[in-house]
Amino acid sequence: MKTAVHALSPDSRPETQHQTRKNEEAAPGSPTPRAGREGRKGPASILRRSPQERCGRGDEPRRTTRHVRFREPLEVAVHYIACREPTTAVQAPSRPRPRGGSLLLRLTACILLALALGMCCGQAGPMARALEDFRARLLAALLRLPLAALDCWRCLLQL
């Protein structure tokens, strides 16, 4: 690797094989500067087409493809997605709540109460009374079931 001193000294520069523009104009009978530039090798240009693109098929010119070389870091993209505001969706009108609460919730509460009561009372007598109470509550809930279904049907008809 060359040091900065060698790179800056005029003696370290190799002589170029091609003539400068002033020397070309001064030399009589020399080819035009453009003709001299076509054959020489230089740094690859970012705008220059690749050799595959230069050789076209017949008279039809090939389309050049463009590639995006820059991509956002993942954390920036994730931050952008997380900060996006959600789209405003049209909300349906809220349904009226049932007055008496959920039937399923009531049944579950009765079953849990009966089981808790049965576990607390280890004797047969209190357990029998708890089961009779559970049976009465279950019968009352089953009698309310058709009324709850009728209320649901009316709510659906109002929508």
Curated annotation (Swiss-Prot):
Main location: membrane
Annotated Gene Ontology cellular component terms: plasma membrane
Biased amino acid composition, Basic and acidic residues: 12-25, 50-63
Keywords attached to this entry: Cell membrane, Membrane, Transmembrane, Transmembrane helix
Keyword DNA-binding listed: no
Transmembrane segments: 107-124
Localization of this protein: Cell membrane
Region Disordered: start-end pairs: 1-67
Membrane topology: Single-pass membrane protein
Ranges in coiled-coil conformation: none
Disulfide pairings: none
Pfam family, one: DUF4658
Domain of life: Eukaryota
PANTHER family according to UniProt: NUTRITIONALLY-REGULATED ADIPOSE AND CARDIAC ENRICHED PROTEIN HOMOLOG (PTHR36868:SF1)
Full protein name: Nutritionally-regulated adipose and cardiac-enriched protein homolog
